Amino acid sequence: IHKSVNLTINLPDVKDQLFTSLIDNFGFRTSSSTAQTLNPYDPLFDANTNKLKFGEIFSQNRKDSLHPLRIEIGSGNGDWVINQCRSSPSPANFLSIELRSDRIAKQIEKMALGGIDNLCVAGGECGKVLRDFVGEKSVECVYVNFPEPPQQRSGDKDESAGHMLKNENLEIIGRSLLGDGRGRFIFVSDNLS
């Protein structure tokens, strides 16, 4: 490694965040409201909407935090989105949404080792992350690159029920895109079925 990375970690904060994440991800918290869940992160959330304040997130690392927001859904290990962060022809901030925690860990490792400061990684089901944390008409572009095809289980009437691109999620994606034809949804797949 030719580049050194300076990370400051506040261990009590990390411990609290990991504990909160475990509670949320394993379903132990059933009666708390979204606002109660987000209390440890108040400076990064809008008090009126409970949506993430991406300007605040990105301004912690960069002088110009007002670049457009672009999102990749189902980012896997993060290769594509990290390459975009480095080489995008126009400056942008990126949000990566991934369901699997092992892949999220790989993305965060690549961010830290690569000095990436225009990427925010979110773990969770894409529709829930977009609905709960991303404001309406706030996203320049949503990318879905080569998603896993929907799997139909025996007895399922709706084969798209567990897929990230089910109708409900497509509606949420549409609401998150900039208005007046400025928002784009780019879907790339090699699956013909």
List each language-model region with its residue ranges.
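Conserved beta-strand signature within the Rossmann-like core of class I S-adenosyl-L-methionine
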Residues: G181-S189
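SAM cofactor-binding core of SAM-dependent methyltransferases
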Residues: P68-K128
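A short glycine-rich, Lys/Arg-flanked "PGG" loop and its adjoining helix->strand segment in the class I
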Residues: M164-G181
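A short acidic, Gly/Pro-enriched loop at the edge of an enzyme's catalytic core
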Residues: R131-C141, F146
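Conserved nucleotide-cofactor-binding alpha/beta core module
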Residues: D102-A105, S160-A161, F185
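Glycine/threonine-rich flexible loop motifs
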Residues: Q152-M164
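S-adenosyl-L-methionine
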Residues: I1-I71, D79-S87
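Conserved class I S-adenosyl-L-methionine
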Residues: S154-D156, V188-S193
